Structure formats: structure tokens, C-alpha cells
């Protein structure tokens, strides 16, 4: 499940947020702290994750400590789905 979350979320970031559908987002690549994703894009990403994986994310979780790379994000989703 974790690999599927990483794949789908990475593809969403590349195509819908960055508008670079062929770009590959590495699992440990910093998203927020590197400036790759801004606060507006972060909200879009959170809505995608909630809708796609049927989990609830608290606004307080939308930060670089929890949401800064695909691996962290997938771990959060897996923990919520359990």
C-alpha cells in the first residue's frame, strides 16, 4: 500500500502541482523545506490525499515535519488507514 501511495502522490505532484508530468519525485526529496511546494500547493496536495486515500488530515499536520517528503506522507496515510 505504501508504494502505491508514493507512486500516486508523486504523480499528482508532478502533473497537477508542478505541471511537469514526466518529472520523478524521489521518496526522500524535500517538498516543503526545499520550496518545491508552496502553502497553496500543500492544501491542494492535502485535499488530493484525503480524497484519494479516504483519510482525514488535520490542518496542524500540514507542515514540513510531517509532510515534507513522499515517504513521510505515505507513512501518515498508512497509519490512518490501519
Q: Residue ranges of each PLM-predicted region?
A:
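Thiotemplate assembly-line natural product biosynthesis machinery
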Residues: 1-23, 75-82
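Phosphopantetheine carrier-protein modules
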Residues: 17-36, 53-63
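Catalytic nucleophile serine of serine hydrolases
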Residues: 39
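Conserved catalytic core of two-component sensor histidine kinases
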Residues: 43
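AMP-binding/adenylate-forming catalytic domain of the ANL superfamily
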Residues: 61-72
Amino acid at each position: 500500500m505504501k508504494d502505491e501511495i508514493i507512486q500516486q502522490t508523486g504523480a499528482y505532484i508532478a502533473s497537477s502541482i508542478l505541471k511537469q508530468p514526466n518529472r520523478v519525485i524521489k521518496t526522500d526529496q524535500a517538498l516543503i523545506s526545499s520550496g518545491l511546494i508552496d502553502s497553496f500547493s500543500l492544501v491542494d496536495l492535502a485535499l488530493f490525499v484525503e480524497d484519494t486515500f479516504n483519510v482525514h488530515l488535520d490542518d496542524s499536520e500540514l507542515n514540513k515535519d510531517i509532510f515534507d517528503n513522499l515517504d513521510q506522507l505515505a507513512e501518515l496515510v498508512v497509519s490512518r488507514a490501519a
